[in-house]
């Protein structure tokens, strides 16, 4: 573990080593670690892909507000999706898998959309029916009414 501090961390028991799997790779951490801290200590920075465009995601915070730390825990019939890695305490033998990728996490097929980022900038779908102005007459009547009249 090259990314771990050699001292500190009053909640971590460095005498009790725990093994776990992330995407099939055998890794290890210590008792008192969260799954997120153990992944970071094992130099696992990429933990998932964005839902829509498959852009790489990593940890940005350490609490319950972390948006990118959702992993699938378990295997087979006991698979539990969308578990937060920042709040899940590490235990021996846990199996964690990243989400939202096709193929391996590092070589995601869906990430081909990165090459089309000039065509699809962030928020492009919010501007779909704004221009041209003269055409707005033809599609404004397609919107549903906000209130129902009885």
Regions found by a protein language model. Name each.
Residues 1-12:
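Charged, low-complexity intrinsically disordered regulatory segments in eukaryotic signaling
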Residues 11-23:
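Eukaryote-biased recognition of intrinsically disordered, low-complexity regulatory segments
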